[in-house]
């Protein structure tokens, strides 16, 4: 039954900007960095998880939520003999799927760009395939908790304010706490802090010189489990 709700929610966004955004955001990120071949992969990932992805995720959630909110204010959905709770969960599910798709499109573009630079400029990959996959999975899972929050923000304060609060203030907060002892208690810093260990990239875009501070596998796993639990709650 829940799958039927998700399928119905997905159909609402057929031929809309919401689905275009899944391709546009990763493509723009890759294109912006392709002409700096030496740092293409590192810069692309840094721009993605620090700037473009938070905006993409927040805007996607807001567009998913506003599809029923808008002018009708959920009146069309409320008049149907369906569970409103399941409709909301379907919105969370669809936004999560779009987030995954966008991230793995970015992963593909990052690796394709890396191999193209290897062939054209003979510059080796700075992020390997396994490392890129692990980094992308961490980005997806560690940011899942933002989806219900962004949907709620969009419903309460609208798209513009939701983007300002989550993609703007939230991202800035995450950047400043990611390299401090407060990173664990600030969910916005989870993704940038994980990238220090998984991809070897600091929030300012510089490669990590000292890997001693890198987290262990179990610490990385703990952060991902906490994010999943918080998302499920």
Describe every region a protein language model picked out.
Residues 23-26, 91-92, 166-167:
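Residue-level recognition of transmembrane alpha-helices
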Residues 12, 77-79, 154:
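Helix-capping/transition residues at the boundaries of transmembrane alpha-helices
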Residues 39-40, 163, 167-233:
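Terminal transmembrane helical anchor/hairpin motif
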Residues 1-23:
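Aromatic- and glycine-rich beta-strand/loop motifs that create alpha-glucan
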